[in-house]
Regions:
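Bacterial Sec-dependent N-terminal signal peptides
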Residues: 1-26
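Pepsin/retropepsin-fold aspartyl endopeptidases
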Residues: 20-425
Length: 425
């Protein structure tokens, strides 16, 4: 997404110099990746937009970031085919890559492979000085996946599905290892046997350790990445909900596997296909309700970008990029420090903290902050005695991670993936 931002700045600025104020505002929101503001302001400004392609870009990016990726495909296609002169070839390529990702996430693997291959041929024929390793990888992966059907969710939706959870992983396959506690673990049934899966809103894909994958007999796919190999599962069950044709990542044994001893993760690739779930921290259960919740007055306050979940969080400095990650602890990043650096000048007390994700673990130095205030959907959230890193760590694009301790602050947390909102009670 960041690549697209700079391309749009370069190609759209000459056009919006003479554009109306609405066009300039929409372009600004797209160029700054301010998707929550774009979603709220676009309906108010759409009738004042002068250039059709600006409105179409807004609608495409709203669909892209609010779990309507199949709808976004057609909009990207129109932008590429009908508005390439206005948006430029660079932006068109970025939109094409997004569309390919959407084809894949929607299970249209053969179409994704064919279109990626066609785009590669076009670039070669044009002689344009464009590198396309991402396109080659998309083609290779989807060609390998093309023999499989798309993932489907079978949910009769006649009664609430209630799934119990525990905060400790009791299904440890390796002796002399300590399981990760203080996370949501739910029973997922594969071939008649229940296994403990971590419910992880910070995981973009469903994950299996190799030891568990070999135990259940997955079908390995002829594709691997730095993180591991892809594998096929014919089905798995979460209560009365069945996921068929599941593509999982079998991890290659980085510290996430060997240190944390996590054998299975239910990731956002499957979770976001559920219309709604309600985490009940009082009764230790997750409910998939038949009757869905009403959208809160504040509207959409949850977005899904590249299968990462983000919450609409504000503080006195403005909007914060807040990753919602039930598989991690709540924490801040160096980006947050930069936004609030002037406030931290007189603070004392530092310590080394360790952060980690699928890339592994890293340590950084952080400053002690007695209290941090922010708001979600108009509700105040106060965090005390937090540590904010003052040294940059790799692969950080967010300001804050709202982790498991955020979830556990509330009796109930509702996540609605149809209308894209979170409600905390």
């Amino acid at each position: 997404m960041r690549k697209l931002v700079f391309i749009l700045i370069a190609y759209c600025l000459p056009l919006v110099v003479n554009a109306q104020e609405a066009d300039m505002r929409i372009s600004e929101l797209i160029n700054t990746s301010n998707w929550f503001a774009l979603e709220k302001e676009y309906p108010l400004l759409k009738d004042s937009i002068q250039y059709d392609f600006v409105g179409l870009m807004a609608e495409a990016m709203i669909a892209q970031n609010f779990n309507k990726e199949k709808e976004a495909i057609g909009m990207f296609r129109t932008l590429i085919n009908s508005h390439q002169q206005q948006i430029g070839s660079g932006a068109a390529l970025s939109f094409a890559e997004m569309a390919l990702g959407n084809y894949e996430r929607c299970g249209m693997y053969r179409l994704a492979a064919d279109k990626a291959n066609g785009l590669i041929d076009q670039i070669k024929t044009s002689g344009a000085p464009i590198d396309y390793p991402k396109l080659l990888d998309i083609h290779k992966r989807n060609k390998a996946l093309s023999k499989y059907d798309s993932t489907i969710v079978i949910h009769r939706n006649t009664k609430d599905v209630i799934v119990p959870f525990t905060m400790n992983n009791s299904d440890v396959l390796f002796d002399k290892q300590t399981p990760v506690s203080n996370r949501y673990y739910i029973p997922v049934t594969i071939h008649g046997v229940a296994y403990q899966f971590m419910f992880d809103t910070g995981a973009t894909t469903t994950y299996l350790s190799k030891r568990l994958a070999d135990r259940i007999g997955v079908e390995y796919i002829d594709y691997s990445s730095p993180y591991g190999s892809l594998a096929y599962l014919d089905s798995m069950q979460l209560g009365d909900v069945t996921f068929k044709n599941v593509i999982a990542l079998v991890h290659n044994g980085t510290p996430l596997d060997s240190i944390c001893n996590i054998d299975a993760v239910l990731g956002m690739d499957l979770v976001r296909q559920l219309d709604e779930l309600r985490i009940d921290n009082k009764n230790n259960q997750i409910t998939l309700p038949v009757k869905k919740s009403k959208k809160p007055e504040c509207g959409r306050n949850l977005r899904c970008t590249n299968q990462f979940l983000f919450v609409d969080v504000m503080d006195e400095k403005g909007s914060l990029v807040a990753l919602l990650d039930s598989g991690a602890e709540t924490g801040f990043t160096y980006n947050y420090f930069l936004k609030h650096q002037s406030e931290f000048g007189q603070l004392r007390g530092t310590k080394e903290i360790v952060t980690g994700n699928v890339d592994g673990f890293q340590s950084t130095m952080a400053i002690h902050v007695p209290s941090v205030n922010m708001s979600i959907c108009g509700h105040e959230l106060n965090m005390k005695d937090v540590y904010v890193p003052y040294m940059k760590a790799k692969n950080e694009n967010n300001d804050i991670v709202l982790g498991i301790d955020f979830f556990r602050k509330y009796n109930y947390v509702t996540l609605n993936f149809k209308d894209m909102f979170i409600v905390c009670e």
